[in-house]
């Protein structure tokens, strides 16, 4: 069937559909569509060395789940911050990097996601990404004035 996701993405698509059972496969437009984020988005883009599970999505309205491998966050995103990957809406790579930092992901894994996103040309404005990442430096344990972005890009080079 044309446009159907490959086997690789089937579990993510199933999780995506379970958030909004009335939505049909391929119905990615419209208000309230769940959006893959964090490690799930990175995995969909094929950046970094992260797995998709637990599946993490955001929706503009609060939703709950009893599935232990599914995280749903309440969050409104601008349509410019979302891309369609294998038929599934996902945060763009720059925002995925920021989300991974905000969620406390291991910085070596974040460095790999960042490096792959840059290498594949998936970051449209590296300067803006640097500002967003550096703004999170203190949270990530960086000394005052140090660049978290530079630290992450150096980690990959080592």
Question: Regions from the language model: what does each represent?
Answer:
Residues 1-92, 99, 103-131, 138-143, ...:
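Short gly/ser-rich loop at a beta-strand->alpha-helix junction or flexible surface loop bordering the NTP-binding
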């Amino acid at each position: 069937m044309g446009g159907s996701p490959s086997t690789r993405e089937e579990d993510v698509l199933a999780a995506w559909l379970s958030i909004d059972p009335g939505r049909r496969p391929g119905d990615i437009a419209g208000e309230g569509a769940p959006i893959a984020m964090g490690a799930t988005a990175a995995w969909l883009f094929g950046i970094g060395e992260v797995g998709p599970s637990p599946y993490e999505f955001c929706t503009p309205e609060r939703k709950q789940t009893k599935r232990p491998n599914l995280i749903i966050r309440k969050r409104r995103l601008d349509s410019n911050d979302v891309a369609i990957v294998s038929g599934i809406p996902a945060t763009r790579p720059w925002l995925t990097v920021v989300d991974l930092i905000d969620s406390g992901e291991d910085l070596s894994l974040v460095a790999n996601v960042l490096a792959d996103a840059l290498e594949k040309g998936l970051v449209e404005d590296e300067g803006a990404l640097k500002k967003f990442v550096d703004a999170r430096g203190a949270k990530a344990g960086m000394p005052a004035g140090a660049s978290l972005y530079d630290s992450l890009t150096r980690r990959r080079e080592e």
